[in-house]
């Protein structure tokens, strides 16, 4: 937000000139109610003790200095015990249009991240079956977060961790092998914990057609072959589903490569040398209690098998070795208990706490016409992400997944999200962009020419309260993006876009654009709409949602 950044810089200079230190608790906020200025600062309240002065007296002193320093300010009111309510000129707000025109698709970007290297790992579903709708929410959050952080000046790399070395993968191979035997008419028994979905039969049938001699193999070799084929087949499907959902992973990292490449053993040795790993009852343990965990954790069981945790430690060690300043893991909410031990691992690797963060994705309750759709991956009873995207479209699905805080449960009604009404959030926002484009097209058809370059004087007719409200809202875009990046919260963007769309729809309903009585206001209002369209398009792009020009 240009206004907030400008006010902050001015206040910091004033405090410095006073020979005082900038207080950590100083804030600049946008008042929720009208009549309290454009911005409110508490600087006099939190600086009074250090200055040895009454807060209101100090506020008066700061206000006088601020008036002399910033010509864009038209009023400073001292409220209550010493709050500074600051109002900026209409010319100042109208410059938002010029900045949007100049920046275009870069409007709202910043250098908040200062090039900090960040890795975002998301989805990382076991390649044991198609992605379901819960994976879709994690995919939308991860992909959008990466877009937002790049726009805010971070150097972001995205990654999918392929869990190809655990028990579930062995079960996958065994399930396909047994299904292949079944298709050949051989008697089989499929235990309860095996994968039973029709896709398992399809994979078995496909492999048998490609390799007629499959069943000539013994059980061990047959299971290995079925595992390799099934994993690659499912992984190819996952990649295609994500591409159709506009989700990109720059790196696909294999867990098996860590085990077979010796990285896990290397990590064990490192922990042992640091006195953080110990043998007990034939198993290898990690002293996670030294880092605040509620109990120590097993790395290698007494039978020699590795726990998931052991690979995860080696994986995160690998991440930091690649030079990332911040590692962000996006996990399902059922993994919340895993966070303390992973933080312990990061600390044991010698990394600072702020170098690791986790975004939790709560469950998606899939509904159809208000009725819950039952889902179970192993039983093969689930709605795939591909089916949902095919039915609702990627735009509606992504926006809906990003419409709420990621760690809050989400009801996703397949019928509701397809409605082309203002009750559908994605339609509401996309229609606002389409409405802007429609007005601009009609203006061109009527021969109304928009100047290639506008200036402040030509925008002077924009002076109404609703126009100033829109301009203040557009000025908040950069701050909203930066805040979403810092908080790892993509839903901040969707909420902001709903607010912008609402303001645009209200403005359009109240104010004539092309049929305005005063001719000198038509072009400025078109310029305002064009700036709104710029923000909507840029914001939707950060969510991976299209900005249609007509609907």
From Swiss-Prot:
Keyword hit for Chloroplast: no
GO biological process: arginyl-tRNA aminoacylation
Subcellular compartments: Cytoplasm
Keywords: Aminoacyl-tRNA synthetase, ATP-binding, Cytoplasm, Ligase, Nucleotide-binding, Protein biosynthesis
Pfam families per the UniProt record, alphabetical: Arg_tRNA_synt_N, DALR_1, tRNA-synt_1d
PROSITE patterns, per database record: AA_TRNA_LIGASE_I (PS00178)
InterPro entries reported in the protein's UniProt record: aa-tRNA-synth_I_CS, Arg-tRNA-ligase, Arg-tRNA-synth_N, Arg-tRNA-synth_N_sf, ArgRS_core, DALR_anticod-bd, Rossmann-like_a/b/a_fold, tRNAsynth_Ia_anticodon-bd
Family indicated by similarity: Belongs to the class-I aminoacyl-tRNA synthetase family.
PANTHER family associated with the record: ARGININE--TRNA LIGASE, CYTOPLASMIC, ARGINYL-TRNA SYNTHETASE
Protein's recorded name: Arginine--tRNA ligase
Organism field: Nitratidesulfovibrio vulgaris (strain DP4) (Desulfovibrio vulgaris)
Taxonomic classification: Bacteria, Pseudomonadati, Thermodesulfobacteriota, Desulfovibrionia, Desulfovibrionales
């Amino acid at each position: 937000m240009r206004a907030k950044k400008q006010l902050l810089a001015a206040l910091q200079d004033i405090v410095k000139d006073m020979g005082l230190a900038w207080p950590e608790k100083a804030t600049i906020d946008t008042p929720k109610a009208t009549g309290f200025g454009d911005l409110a600062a508490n600087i006099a309240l939190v600086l009074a003790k250090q200055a040895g002065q009454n807060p209101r007296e100090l506020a008066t002193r700061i206000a006088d200095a601020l008036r002399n320093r910033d010509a864009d300010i038209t009023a400073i009111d001292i409220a209550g015990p010493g709050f500074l309510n600051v109002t900026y000129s209409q010319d100042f707000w109208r410059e938002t249009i010029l900045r949007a025109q100049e920046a275009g698709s870069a409007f709202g970007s910043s250098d908040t991240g200062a090039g900090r290297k960040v890795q975002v790992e998301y989805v990382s579903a076991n390649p044991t079956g198609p992605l379901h709708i819960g994976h879709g929410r994690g995919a939308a959050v991860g992909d959008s977060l990466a877009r937002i952080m790049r726009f805010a000046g971070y150097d972001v790399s995205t990654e999918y961790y392929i869990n190809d070395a655990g028990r579930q993968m062995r079960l996958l191979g065994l399930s396909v092998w047994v299904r292949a035997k079944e298709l050949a008419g051989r008697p089989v028994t499929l235990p309860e914990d095996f994968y039973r979905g029709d896709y398992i039969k399809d994979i078995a049938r496909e492999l048998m057609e490609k390799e007629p001699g499959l069943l000539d193999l013994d059980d061990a070799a047959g299971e290995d072959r079925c595992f390799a084929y099934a994993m690659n087949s499912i992984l190819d499907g996952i990649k295609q589903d994500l591409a159709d959902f506009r989700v990109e992973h720059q790196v696909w990292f294999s867990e098996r490569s860590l085990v077979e490449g010796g990285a896990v053993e290397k990590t064990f040795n490192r922990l042992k040398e640091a006195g953080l790993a110990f043998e007990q009852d034939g198993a290898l343990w990690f002293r996670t209690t030294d880092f605040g965990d509620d109990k120590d954790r097993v790395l290698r069981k007494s039978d020699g098998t590795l726990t998931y945790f052991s690979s995860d430690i080696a994986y995160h060690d690998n991440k930091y070795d690649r030079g990332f300043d911040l590692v962000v893991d996006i996990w399902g909410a059922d993994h919340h208990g895993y966070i303390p031990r992973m933080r312990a691992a990061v600390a044991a690797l010698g990394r600072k706490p702020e170098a690791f963060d986790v975004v939790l994705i709560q469950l998606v309750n899939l509904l159809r016409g208000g009725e819950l759709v039952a889902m179970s991956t192993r039983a093969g009873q689930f709605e795939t992400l591909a089916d949902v995207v095919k039915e609702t479209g990627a735009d509606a699905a992504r926006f809906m997944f990003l419409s709420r805080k990621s760690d809050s449960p989400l009801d996703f009604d397949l019928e509701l999200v397809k409605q082309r009404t203002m009750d559908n959030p994605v339609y509401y926002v996309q229609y606002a962009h389409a409405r802007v484009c429609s007005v601009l097209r009609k203006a061109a058809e009527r021969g109304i020419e928009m100047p290639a370059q506008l200036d402040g004087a030509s925008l002077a007719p924009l002076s109404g309260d609703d126009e100033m409200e829109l301009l203040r809202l557009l000025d908040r875009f950069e701050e909203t993006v930066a805040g979403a990046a810092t908080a790892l919260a993509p839903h901040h963007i969707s909420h902001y876009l709903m607010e912008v769309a609402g303001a645009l729809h209200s403005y359009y309903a109240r104010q004539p654009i092309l049929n305005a009585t005063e001719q000198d206001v038509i072009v400025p209002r078109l310029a305002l709409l064009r700036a709104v369209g710029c923000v909507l398009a840029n914001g939707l792009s950060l969510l991976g949602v299209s900005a249609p020009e007509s609907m």
